[in-house]
Amino acid sequence: MKTLYSLRRFYPVETLFNGTLALAGRDQETTGFAWWAGNARLINLSGKLLGAHVAHAGLIVFWAGAMNLFEVAHFVPEKPMYEQGLILLPHLATLGWGVGPGGEVIDTFPYFVSGVLHLISSAVLGFGGIYHALLGPETLEESFPFFGYVWKDRNKMTTILGIHLILLGIGAFLLVFKALYFGGVYDTWAPGGGDVRKITNLTLSPSVIFGYLLKSPFGGEGWIVSVDDLEDIIGGHVWLGSICIFGGIWHILTKPFAWARRALVWSGEAYLSYSLGALAVFGFIACCFVWFNNTAYPSEFYGPTGPEASQAQAFTFLVRDQRLGANVGSAQGPTGLGKYLMRSPTGEVIFGGETMRFWDLRAPWLEPLRGPNGLDLSRLKKDIQPWQERRSAEYMTHAPLGSLNSVGGVATEINAVNYVSPRSWLATSHFVLGFFLFVGHLWHAGRARAAAAGFEKGIDRDFEPVLSMTPLN
C-alpha cells in the first residue's frame, strides 16, 4: 500500500518514551527519523537531547580554548594583531586584557589563561555530554521533573525561555562589571591614541540608548552600528541586561496570554525555527557591526574599516602633497571637484576624490583635525601630528578589501603582501552563517506550521533507491 503520510505524522511531539525499549529514540522504527536526521531522533528523549546539547557546548568551548592557545603560540608582539590573522586575541584585547597605551600588547599571559580555562571547561562539558548521551536517563520527566518538559507545555516553555533570558542578562552585566570594576576595557578614543580605562560615567539616559534604535540605518545615521563611545556601549549593556533579567523573571512567573497561545506554534520544531531566526538576525547585525564600527571593534586590533582605510589614503596623500607645496584647500581634481578637500551636500568640508562617499567616517586619528564645519583647513596646515601620519599610512595599506571591485579609491596592488583583514573574515563569516541560519529558519518554520496544520505529507518513500540496496549490517 502506498504510504500517503510520512511516519513522522504518527509520532506526535508529546509522546514520552519511557525507556523500556532498548533502542527507543535511536532507530527509524521508533522515531520516524533515520540516523542522518541527527537530533530529530531525540525530540522526545529529553535526557539524550540534553546530552547532545551539552556535548555540542563542549565542542564549541574546546574550539575556543584550542584556537585561543594556537593564536597565543603564533603571536608576534611586534606586529599588529590584524596582520597575523587573529580573530580571538583581538576580542580579549578589546576587553582590556594584556594591552596598554595605543593597543600595544604588554602581556600575553592573560590570553594563555583564557585558552587553558576554556580547555578545562570543555573537558567538563564533554564528560557531561557523554554521560547524558550514553549513561544518563533517556527522559528527565520521571526522575527530575524540574528539568523535564513536554514541547506542548506552554507554561514550561516560557519558564525555560525566562531562564535563558536571565542567563543572557547576566552575560551582559559581566561586560558591565569588567568595564566598571575589573580593570576596564580598551577605549580606542582615549587621548593620545587609545588606552585601557575604567568606564565611570555610564550613559543611562533612555532617550540616548533607545535613540540608536530609532535612527535610520543609512549613511551618517547608521542605526545602533553608529555607536562611537564606550559610555553608550556599556550603558546599553546595563539596559539590555536589566531588560533580559526582568523579562526572564516575567516569563518564569507568568503563563502565555491567550493571544500568544493562539498566534504561535507550540512544538519543538517551531522553537527551533524561532531560535534560528533570532540567530540569523544576530549574525546580520554582527556583520554590520564588525565591518563599520571601530569603537566596539578597535582598528588597533581588527585593522581599519573599509571607509577608514579609504579616508586614511586621502589623508596620507594630502599630507604628502601639502609638504611638496600643493595648496590643498584649492587644488582641483580631474572632475572639477576639490582634489584633496571638497564640501559635502550639507556644507561640511570633507576629503575629496573617490573617498567622498565615506565622508561620515569617524576615527580617533582624524577627529582632532575637525572643526565645527568638518575638516578644519588651518588644523590640516598646522596641527597634523606624526602619530596621525603613521597610523593613517598603516591603515591605508591594510584595507579590509579582499577582492572587491569597488574599493573606495584605495590603491590596490596585485603583487602586494598576502593580507586578509580580520574584519573581512568576521563580517563575511557572520553574514554567510546568518544567511544559512535564516534559510534554516524558513525551512523549519514551514515544516512546523505544516505539522501544526496537519498537512505535512513527507516524501513518498516507495521508489527511494535506498530501499533496493543491501542493508548495511
Swiss-Prot record:
GO biological process: photosynthetic electron transport in photosystem II
Transmembrane feature ranges: 69-93, 134-155, 178-200, 255-275, 291-312, 447-471
Propeptide: 1-14
Major localization listed first in the record, in broad terms: plastid
InterPro entries per UniProt: PS_antenna-like, PS_II_antenna-like_sf, PSII_PsbC, PSII_PsbC_sf
Cofactor binding description: Binds multiple chlorophylls and provides some of the ligands for the Ca-4Mn-5O cluster of the oxygen-evolving complex. It may also provide a ligand for a Cl- that is required for oxygen evolution. PSII binds additional chlorophylls, carotenoids and specific lipids.
GO CC annotation: chloroplast thylakoid membrane; photosystem II
Compartments it resides in: Plastid, Chloroplast thylakoid membrane
Membrane-topology annotation of the record: Multi-pass membrane protein
Location of N-acetylthreonine modifications: T15
UniProt keyword terms in alphabetical order: Acetylation, Chlorophyll, Chloroplast, Chromophore, Manganese, Membrane, Metal-binding, Phosphoprotein, Photosynthesis, Photosystem II, Plastid, Thylakoid, Transmembrane, Transmembrane helix
Residues that coordinate or bind [CaMn4O5] cluster: E367
Gene Ontology molecular function, alphabetical: chlorophyll binding; electron transporter, transferring electrons within the cyclic electron transport pathway of photosynthesis activity; metal ion binding
Residue(s) carrying Phosphothreonine: T15
Matching Gene3D superfamilies: photosystem ii from thermosynechococcus elongatus
NCBIfam families per the UniProt record, alphabetical: psbC
Family from the record: Belongs to the PsbB/PsbC family. PsbC subfamily.
Biological function: One of the components of the core complex of photosystem II (PSII). It binds chlorophyll and helps catalyze the primary light-induced photochemical processes of PSII. PSII is a light-driven water:plastoquinone oxidoreductase, using light energy to abstract electrons from H(2)O, generating O(2) and a proton gradient subsequently used for ATP formation.
Assembly behavior: PSII is composed of 1 copy each of membrane proteins PsbA, PsbB, PsbC, PsbD, PsbE, PsbF, PsbH, PsbI, PsbJ, PsbK, PsbL, PsbM, PsbT, PsbX, PsbY, PsbZ, Psb30/Ycf12, at least 3 peripheral proteins of the oxygen-evolving complex and a large number of cofactors. It forms dimeric complexes.
Name of the protein: Photosystem II CP43 reaction center protein
